[in-house]
C-alpha cells in the first residue's frame, strides 16, 4: 500500500548485513507496496544488486511477503558523480549502455524490471570533502564541466533508449538546469527534491515528476519552509515519495538507520501538510509511478 520510490540495497546490506536486510525487507513487505525501486551508483552494479536482493527476499520465511516483494521490486542503473566517474565518464557511460542492454536481455529474474537510468546529476556536496589529499580548492570550472558532461551523457542515453531518468541534484541547480536545457530529455523523476518553489517550477514546466524523502520532515533546516512550500505546490499528478534509505530517516527517527518501512512516516507527514488522507496520497503516488513507467 505504501510504495518506496527509491532505496539503496547495497548500502543497506553494507550497514546491516544480509540477514538483517532480509528482516528489513520483510518488515517493508508488511506495507504491501505496489512499487519499490533499488537504485545503483556505478555502471554495472545491477547484476550484484539483483542477485543480493533476490537472496534476501528468498530468505524470508513468509511466502506471501516474498510474493509481494518480487512483484514490487524494480531497478535503476546509473553513475553517481565522484572523482573516478567524472574522469572516466565516456567509457563508463558506454559500459552503462552495454550493461543495460545485456541485463534486459538476460535470464535474470528481474531482467524486465530495469526501468530507469540513474540517479545521475550534479552534486556539489561530494566536492567539499577531502579525497586523497585534495580539498575543495582543487575543484575548478573544468571539474564542474566534466561533472555536467557525465550527467548529459546519461540523459542522452536515456533519450536514446527511451528510458526515464532519475535526477540527483545537490547544491547544483543552475548546472542541472543547463544540462536539461541542452539535452532536452525530460522524462523521469527529480529524486530527494531539496530546492525551493522557484526551482520546482522549472522542473515541473519541463515535465519532471518530483520525489520527496525524509528531509522534508527536518524542521531545523534553513530551507525548511521552502521545502514545505514545495510539498504543497507540487500538482497531484506529479508527486512521488521515497526513503532514499539507508539515508535521511524521517522525524521522529532521524538518529536511526533509515529503511523502506519508514516511508510510512513520510506519507503521513506529507499527507498532513497537503490536507489529504494518508491512504489517498499513497494511491496518488502509485498512479503516478504507474503512469511514468508504464506499469500494469
Enumerate the language-model features and the residues they cover.
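Mid-domain alpha/beta scaffold segments of enzyme catalytic cores
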Residues: 1-296
Amino acid at each position: 500500500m505504501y510504495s518506496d520510490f527509491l532505496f539503496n540495497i547495497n548500502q543497506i546490506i553494507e550497514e546491516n548485513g544480509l540477514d538483517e536486510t532480509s528482516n528489513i525487507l520483510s518488515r517493508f513487505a508488511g506495507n504491501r507496496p505496489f512499487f519499490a525501486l533499488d537504485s545503483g551508483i556505478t555502471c554495472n552494479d545491477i547484476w550484484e544488486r539483483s542477485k543480493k536482493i533476490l537472496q534476501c527476499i528468498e530468505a524470508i520465511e513468509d511466502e506471501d511477503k516474498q510474493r509481494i516483494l518480487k512483484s514490487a521490486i524494480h531497478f535503476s542503473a546509473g553513475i553517481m558523480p565522484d572523482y573516478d566517474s567524472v574522469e572516466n565518464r565516456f567509457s563508463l557511460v558506454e559500459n552503462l549502455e552495454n550493461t543495460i542492454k545485456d541485463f534486459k536481455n538476460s535470464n535474470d529474474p528481474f531482467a524486465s524490471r530495469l526501468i530507469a537510468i540513474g540517479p545521475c546529476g550534479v552534486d556539489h556536496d561530494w566536492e567539499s570533502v577531502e579525497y586523497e589529499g585534495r580539498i575543495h580548492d582543487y575543484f575548478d570550472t573544468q571539474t564542474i564541466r566534466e561533472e555536467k558532461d557525465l550527467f548529459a551523457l546519461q540523459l542522452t542515453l536515456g533519450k536514446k533508449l527511451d528510458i526515464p531518468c532519475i535526477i540527483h541534484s545537490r547544491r547544483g541547480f543552475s548546472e542541472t538546469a543547463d544540462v536539461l536545457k541542452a539535452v532536452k530529455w525530460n522524462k523521469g523523476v527529480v529524486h530527494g527534491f531539496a530546492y525551493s518553489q522557484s526551482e520546482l517550477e522549472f522542473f515541473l514546466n519541463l515535465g519532471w515528476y518530483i520525489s520527496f524523502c525524509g528531509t522534508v520532515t527536518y524542521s531545523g533546516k534553513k530551507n525548511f519552509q521552502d521545502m514545505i512550500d514545495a510539498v504543497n505546490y507540487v500538482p497531484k499528478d506529479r508527486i512521488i515519495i521515497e526513503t532514499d534509505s539507508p539515508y535521511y530517516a524521517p522525524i521522529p527517527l532521524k538518529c536511526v538507520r533509515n529503511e523502506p518501512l519508514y516511508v510510512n512516516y513520510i506519507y503521513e507527514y506529507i499527507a498532513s501538510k497537503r490536507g489529504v488522507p494518508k491512504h489517498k496520497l499513497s494511491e496518488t503516488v502509485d498512479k503516478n509511478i504507474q503512469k511514468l513507467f508504464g506499469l500494469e
